[in-house]
Curated annotation (Swiss-Prot):
One of its GO terms (molecular function) is metal ion binding. This enzyme catalyzes only one turnover and therefore is not strictly catalytic. According to one definition, an enzyme is a biocatalyst that acts repeatedly and over many reaction cycles. It catalyses: a 6-O-methyl-2'-deoxyguanosine in DNA + L-cysteinyl-[protein] = S-methyl-L-cysteinyl-[protein] + a 2'-deoxyguanosine in DNA; a 4-O-methyl-thymidine in DNA + L-cysteinyl-[protein] = a thymidine in DNA + S-methyl-L-cysteinyl-[protein]. Belongs to the MGMT family. It comes from Bos taurus. Its cofactor is Zn(2+). Keywords: DNA damage, DNA repair, DNA-binding, Metal-binding, Methyltransferase, Nucleus, Transferase, Zinc. Its EC number is 2.1.1.63. It comes from the Eukaryota. The active site is at C9 (nucleophile). GO terms for cellular component: nucleus. This is Methylated-DNA--protein-cysteine methyltransferase.
Amino acid sequence: NPIPILTPC
């Protein structure tokens, strides 16, 4: 994921 803070994984 390019934005790990917005994604749970």
